[in-house]
Amino acid sequence: MNYYTTAETPLGELIIAEEEDRITRLFLSQEDWVDWKETVQNTEHKETPNLAEAKQQLQEYFAGERKTFSLPLSQKGTPFQQKVWQALERIPYGESRSYADIAAAVGSPKAVRAVGQANKRNDLPIFVPCHRVIGKNSALTGYAGSKTEIKAFLLNIERISYKEK
């Protein structure tokens, strides 16, 4: 069974999903949520303890009171994607890394584009902070598809400097 709840944030209403007692998705837009919900069976709006905690931690993050998340997270991906997502979780609050930095950190220094694709497939943005990955010249690059304004907002919360493309 999949459960979900909504969280009011400065970005608008975000939707958090849980499956098998693990947080599995954070939707930044209604469109993404609707697309997902149409493909998944057995989905119920219910605020489980994990979803309530995720919602609380998100609210603390947006209020500037939380620097790291401590939630039971799970997302499906290739072994390479899993390594990238783990590397993202190690980027400290208020710091950024380049795609090349992440590629090197996962032992594949030439896999810069693959790191970008793994970021794009991150189903847990904010919780797994792919917004902290910027271009090698501090350029603001893609986020959650084409949502660079969200990335800029998150970088500003954390006071991470970047350059507009």
Swiss-Prot record:
The GO molecular function terms of this record are: methylated-DNA-[protein]-cysteine S-methyltransferase activity
List, alphabetically, the InterPro entries matched: MethylDNA_cys_MeTrfase_AS, MethylDNA_cys_MeTrfase_DNA-bd, MethylDNA_cys_MeTrfase_DNAb, MethylG_MeTrfase_N, MGMT, MGMT_N_sf, WH-like_DNA-bd_sf
Instruction: Give the UniProt subcellular location, in the record's own words.
Output: Cytoplasm
Pfam name, any one: DNA_binding_1
What reaction does this catalyse?
A: a 6-O-methyl-2'-deoxyguanosine in DNA + L-cysteinyl-[protein] = S-methyl-L-cysteinyl-[protein] + a 2'-deoxyguanosine in DNA; a 4-O-methyl-thymidine in DNA + L-cysteinyl-[protein] = a thymidine in DNA + S-methyl-L-cysteinyl-[protein]
GO BP annotations of the record are: DNA alkylation repair; methylation
* Residues at the active site: C130
The record's disulfide annotation reads none
The stretch of residues making up the signal peptide is none
Q: GO cellular-component terms in the record?
A: cytoplasm
Q: Does the keyword Methyltransferase apply?
A: yes
Q: What induces it?
A: Constitutively expressed.
Enzyme Commission designation? 2.1.1.63
Other observations noted: Bacillus subtilis contains 2 species of O-6-methylguanine-DNA alkyltransferases. Ogt and adaB are regulated in different ways, constitutively and inducibly on adaptive treatment, respectively.
Task: Please report which protein family the annotation says this sequence is part of.
Answer: Belongs to the MGMT family.
Q: What is this protein called?
A: Methylated-DNA--protein-cysteine methyltransferase, constitutive
What is the name of the gene encoding this protein? ogt
